[in-house]
Amino acid sequence: TKISNHINDFGSEGRDSTISTLHKADIAYAGLRKKCETTVVIRNGKRIGICCFSPNAVTVNILNITYATTLVRSLREKCDYVIVSFHGGGEGKEFLHVTREEEFCFGQSRGNVYLFAHACIDAGADLVFGHGASLR
């Protein structure tokens, strides 16, 4: 599963409880800055590397493209497939399409998701999928 923009909604207690529950259920996760930035799962004998990003505190930051591509390259070296997931982009009906520019939500930079995705592909990602904020 992906650690993303809501992981800190209930502070460190909620975050720790979520991580504990994932461990107990033997569910792999990635995207938690400095703790579990990437994960590798094995399915049908294939190593699948997963890294996840968002613009929020305690997550691996989508705004640091250099670091993101470093993680992707690291996974590429040891995995058969590399998957990148990210939460980014603006919010609201005016953001229904990718702008190819930096987008903001409530004053917070959500990054340039077009640039981010292409950088991850160039670094070796096999699949990049993104999701954004709720439409209002």
Residue ranges and their predicted role:
Residues 1-136:
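Acidic, metal/ion-coordinating pockets
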